[in-house]
């Protein structure tokens, strides 16, 4: 959440807009606020769970898509999805998780924030303010016997080390 009285520090937040229309879907709004010389600047993203695209609809060339599917369906290993803001990392990750999500597969995610809620997935939102860091979450995951772990961000060496251990 955000503290609206704090205008000196960058902040992240989220709200859900409830669609009251018949058959409407709720929309999550994620936002980031930064202080600038001329006042606060905000960037907002609108997210709908129904917008999780299938893997074959996200624009990966077919040859590369086959390699990606083979990698995410592998029982071991690590797949890194990298790129600048707005390049499709989140879209790719969620499409990949959706592709392999089956009731018998234990999938755990560590995210900041959880951008789309997915049925059957153990999603945990990191919260460094209370000590719930990516490395803390990953250590807990290792005791949950997951087949798949998604880490939204790798911010430090400790998280790298645990992620590599989990991938082996």
What residue ranges belong to the model's regions?
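N-terminal "pre-motor" subdomain/linker immediately upstream of P-loop NTPase catalytic cores
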Residues: 1-87
